[in-house]
Swiss-Prot record:
Protein's UniProt name: 4-hydroxy-2-oxovalerate aldolase 2
SS bonds (residue pairs): none
Site residues by UniProt (Transition state stabilizer): R17
One GO BP: L-leucine biosynthetic process
Amino acid sequence: MTAQPTKKLYISDVTLRDGSHAIRHQYSLEHVRRIAAALDAARVDSIEVAHGDGLSGSSFNYGFGAHTDLEWIAAVAETVRHARVATLLLPGVGTLHDLRAAYDAGARVVRVATHCTEADVSRQHIEYARELGMDTVGFLMMSHMTTPAALAQQAKLMESYGAQCVYVVDSGGALGMQDVRERFRAFKDVLRPETQTGMHAHHNLSLGVANSIVAVEEGCDRVDASLAGMGAGAGNAPLEVFIAAAERLGWQHGCDLYTLMDAADDIVRPLQDRPVRVDRETLALGYAGVYSSFLRHAEAAAARYGLGTVDILVELGRRRMVGGQEDMIVDVALDLLARRSAQAGQAVPSAAVA
């Protein structure tokens, strides 16, 4: 039987980073301050803030942010008294210069994120973060796309570069509970005892909280979650729900549940221009194993070309597209449009391919 945790869990909030996807990266500085103040009052351990795609993610490909990463980071740093300010960096999107600037703005935790089979590209960023004295975390995205043993070897690479914690990141919300269990057991087999592990869940199959609980049962130290589940796709594990479940299990988490409940309903949920929930489109993400932040891009392409969002998402999953390939969503839409036109014996309208 799995042992119950006796240590205090590290609660990592991602409302102001992953949650940015849910509103197309349009958080105002006032939104950021209000959310950060509520999270700080609830005593979460860290608050991650950046464009949804990490430092320097604001771009034509990913979507432009309402503010710069440094403005958002500084707003959180000026607000909090307890929580540490965290940020996310994807090598190839964010640079060492961006990391230094984020540190100067107040970030003290960085999660260096790569695709689950590409940990080797994180070396210089992890090493530099350690030089800065940051709490340095490896973040293995789309963890469902490789085996537990192979994922563990990638985690070991990140550990060897200096990562103090390595995450199983279910970017597609596609992992089942046994999948999570097997990945944490594989981590335990190869990582040093002092290296922490973390779980970042998405709720596309409604398993965000369940998978986080399984991870903790397997020795996970850090849990990502967001207020009202605010995040890409069907969102992350809802923070207030996870804390309520952890409380009922008798786990030490250090957070004020009622403050989180109020913040979720009174501050965060009203910001959603598209409900963050499991529905036809977000369920397709988890079913097909598609990167959750593709949702809004796929919906835009579907509207533009008169296609079904689910059809685009399922095709993206079939082609095993990964984070960073947002530009391919339009290509997939055009391929589907051409296929449909060919079946109907029609040419693709020239306006559609312009």
